[in-house]
Regions:
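Helix-to-loop junction immediately C-terminal to a conserved catalytic motif
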Residues: 50
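ABC ATPase nucleotide-binding domains
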Residues: 31, 72-78, 82-229
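Conserved ABC transporter NBD signature motif
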Residues: 58-66
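Pre-Walker A (P-loop) beta-loop-beta motif of ABC nucleotide-binding domains
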Residues: 22-33
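The feature captures the beta-strand-to-loop junction immediately N-terminal to the Walker
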Residues: 35-37
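Non-catalytic connector elements of ABC transporters
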Residues: 237, 247-378
Length: 378
């Protein structure tokens, strides 16, 4: 529908920096998520894109046209809010039809278009119902249908699923993606829900303290995070302190064991770093150390099990015996390991376990948090 560019956007509220030097190009038909914790600037960025807030500096470009100073209704954008924002005195049909009526579309044309949209969103049977007669999921579907009815160049979604329950949320995010692909609408989704962003986005923009932390595809953000913030914010991540032995060769050391690890190449020799690995990538070896085959192992005691359905998460505390005599390497306080629930009974709370850490499924990063680990702070 449209190409969107945000160029060096900045925004302050008093002395507080809300958004700092934000630049992003969104391709025609792409769905990009702004993901981050509360207060990171994602909604403010969306509101500046829509025209509800003016940036202190920077520009908003749609298909090569600078719309920074245009009012909201002149930007060819549709917006869906967290709280639905439906007209309570209008039926679902009338809500969806509203934007078309304001634009003076012929009655027959707009009624046909509304009927098509209601079917697209599974609302054909509730078209004559008022908002208070609809469930939360149905109200949000009406809001989505109303937003796309005017065929906007860009669709802006501000936490659209946060007010519905988990089951409906999962259904709606699938519907949003299906609708977005079918209609080809360039879309920005603001969310704090990692699974929501990762499951339906073409790219994810991770935001932190008003700035872009990193941008990538869902797979890149999840499997290859470039910062400790992203690694910790996106799903569960183990952070294992290591020392860079040879940046030239990408070699790190843990308890005297040296391995080649992804991401270590080029890092300064002697620096502390973090070896990042997801709980599902770790492999329990029982109570005896198997052949390492270039990987690391860690010995821990199971503190608690958390049932997650098909998998169970074991929370381990590393045992001091895993350290070499005289090593200055700080221990990993805790480690999360996912195992099939069918076999979780092998490792009850209190049991000792050796875990294989496959370096091929890990990534090394340097970060100030690594320095905190080296001081024993976690």
């Amino acid at each position: 529908m449209a190409r969107l560019e945000l160029n060096k956007i900045n925004k302050r509220f008093g002395d507080q920096v809300a958004v700092a030097d934000f630049s992003l190009a969104v391709a025609d038909g792409e769905l990009v998520s702004f993901l981050g914790p509360s207060g990171c600037g994602k909604t403010t960025t969306l509101r500046m894109t829509a025209g509800f807030e003016l940036p202190d500096s920077g520009s908003v470009i749609v298909d090569g046209v600078d719309v920074t100073d245009l009012p909201t209704n002149k930007r060819a954008m549709g917006m869906v809010f967290q709280g639905y924002a439906l007209f309570p005195n209008m039926t679902a049909i009338e809500n969806v039809e509203f934007g078309l009526a304001v634009r003076g579309r012929p009655v027959a044309e707009r009624r046909a278009q509304v009927a098509e949209l209601l079917e697209l969103f599974g609302l054909g049977h509730v078209g004559g119902s008022y908002p208070h007669q609809l469930s939360g999921g149905q109200q949000q579907r009406v809001a989505l249908a109303r937003a796309v009815a005017v065929k906007p160049g860009v669709l802006l979604l501000d936490e659209p699923l946060s007010a519905v329950d988990a089951k409906v949320r999962e259904e709606l995010r699938t519907e949003i993606r299906r609708m977005q692909v079918q209609l080809g609408i360039t879309t920005i989704l603001v969310t704090h829900d990692q699974s929501e962003a990762l499951s339906i986005s073409d790219r994810v923009v991770v935001m932190n303290r008003g700035s872009i932390e990193e941008i990538g595809t869902p797979t890149q953000i999840y499997a290859e995070p470039r910062s400790a913030f992203t690694a910790g914010f996106i799903g569960a991540m183990n952070e294992i302190p290591v020392r860079i032995v040879s940046g030239a060769n990408g070699i790190v050391e843990r308890w005297g064991r040296r391995v080649t690890a992804p991401g270590a190449a080029g890092l300064p020799d002697g620096d502390m770093a973090l070896l990042l690995v997801r709980p599902e990538s770790l492999e329990p070896l029982g109570t005896t150390k198997a052949a390492l085959n270039g990987d690391l192992t860690l010995t821990g005691r199971v503190e608690v099990q958390t049932f997650l359905g098909a998998t169970t998460r074991l929370l381990l505390r590393e045992l001091p015996g895993g350290a070499d005599e005289g090593s200055a390497m700080p221990p990993t306080q805790r480690l999360a390991v996912d195992v099939p629930s069918s076999s979780a009974g092998q490792w009850p709370a209190g049991s000792e376990i050796v875990v294989r850490i496959p370096v091929t499924a890990s990534r090394v990063i340097t970060d100030r948090s690594a320095e905190r680990h080296s001081r024993g702070v976690h």
